Amino acid sequence: MEWKNLDKCTSFTQLQKAHKEQAENLKLADIFDTENSVKRVKNYSVKMGGNLKYNYAAKPVNDEILKALQSLADEQKLIEKYELLLNGDFINTGENRMVLHQLTRGQLKNDVVYKGVNMRSFYLNELKKIKEFSEAVHSGKIKTSQGKVFTDVVQIGIGGSDLGPRAMYIALKNRAKKKMRAHFISNVDPDDAAEVLNSINLASTLFILVSKSGTTQETLANERFVKSVLEKNGLDCKKQMLAVTSETSPLANNPDYLTSFYMDDFIGGRYSSTSVCGAAVLALAFGMETVEAFLKGAAEGDKLSLNKNIKENASLLDALLGVYERNILGCSATAILPYSQALSRFPAHLQQLDMESNGKTVNRFGEKVSYKTGPVIFGEPGTNGQHSFYQLLHQGSDIIPLQFIGFKKSQIGLDIESEGSTNMQKLNANLAAQIMAFAAGKTDENKNKDFAGNRPASLIYGEELNPENLGALLAHYENKVMFQGFIWNLNSFDQEGVQLGKTLAKKVLSNDMPPALKAFSEFLL
């Protein structure tokens, strides 16, 4: 398989040429001021997993640009590289590892066997263990150290052990039937743990410690914090804490834990929401039926991502459009704008997923690249964001592409009508209006009220945010990031940028540091 930099692709040169030739035909304000605008909106949609669709009508593209993007996908052999990943090739060159998060939700290609272990069977077995354990907890067969029924679960982890699972839980807590309340402790700031512990009944709470290596500094510090509080309250930690870790970590088969569920080195933290890292807390909170629907949606998204036709592959098209915006239009950021309060933490998860994966300046062979790579990712639910940072999005000097997410129905179903419309109708009216406002703008003699428009936007939409659609949404973005890494010739599955700060922090704590670092630390220690 040939792996090459973006600027070495003939198709990238063709894309640059096509954009230059088509620039006058790509102004969104003009596109939406024609008779064909309605047809464009309806036709520029691609099926995703669940009942979701990806609409790109408000992107500055036409047939010529799409043709050039298809050529880029073909030249970079994006689907073939995806197939290599699914078949167990060691795609993570930095750590010499396979990349198997898609295998946690379904098998699309060959069996992946490592050291005699069928990895799909391994993941299914861990899910079976989670199902049996969660059902035993819900039935009262497994009780607290004081013989009580568990009512709450707290996940202790950081990074991918927190952001993804927390975002998924919040996304479903109004929709799924709750069996236990879930909480999360991530920051080593003691106020984070103290706030959670002060809000729950410790005697009826189960704690999940999540650390693949079993050595994560912040997570182990929070574990000690939690254990000290439990012990002060006369509770047996061994009967109220379980571990999610790797089979080779110090936490594995450890009698200090009620039980252990296992992950492996082939699933990166930011890609671990469909592994035991996310499944354990979701199964305890909602039951295994919800987890299975979530995994089903993700598996469907993975399957659709195998299509070579970019007009029929939403994650591939989204990835290519993102590269077009980054490397042709020069956009340095992307805003994730879910018009769903349930997705309030989804932008934070995508921020880690995207920026930790593709925030690189060297290619997969360690050679510096000469082009821009991953954008800055940020976002906030609508309509809240409209009253916060949309001013810059509309009239700022930088053009920032927008990714809207919306649903026809609310999760709870409770709503009222006022001034001729329901709150849900008001929410979605604002979403639709924003897409057009960003695209078409508004001319005004008062320059302070003039909107240039031509702000690119996409829309992911569906009936409702349920477990299956959430899984499909997650898989869409995971696969989008993967494809972009392939296009830029990056290794999207390591994160060396996380390590340097950790190393220096240890030097501070051991008082073995250079003078400048010591001077900074003395402000705070």
Swiss-Prot record:
GO molecular function: carbohydrate derivative binding; glucose-6-phosphate isomerase activity; monosaccharide binding
A Pfam family that the UniProt record links to this protein: PGI
Enzyme class label: isomerase
Listed Gene3D superfamilies: 1.10.1390.10, Glucose-6-phosphate isomerase like protein, domain 1
Associated pathway: Carbohydrate biosynthesis; gluconeogenesis; Carbohydrate degradation; glycolysis; D-glyceraldehyde 3-phosphate and glycerone phosphate from D-glucose: step 2/4
Reaction catalyzed: alpha-D-glucose 6-phosphate = beta-D-fructose 6-phosphate
Example GO biological process: glycolytic process
InterPro entries (alphabetical): G6P_Isomerase, G6P_Isomerase_C, Phosphoglucose_isomerase_CS, SIS_dom_sf, SIS_PGI_1, SIS_PGI_2
Active site: E356 (proton donor), H387, K502
Entry keyword set: Cytoplasm, Gluconeogenesis, Glycolysis, Isomerase
GO cellular component terms attached to this protein's record: cytosol
E.C. designation(s): 5.3.1.9
Subcellular location: Cytoplasm
Function (record text): Catalyzes the reversible isomerization of glucose-6-phosphate to fructose-6-phosphate.
Family label: Belongs to the GPI family.
Protein's name according to its UniProt entry: Glucose-6-phosphate isomerase
Organism name: Treponema denticola (strain ATCC 35405 / DSM 14222 / CIP 103919 / JCM 8153 / KCTC 15104)
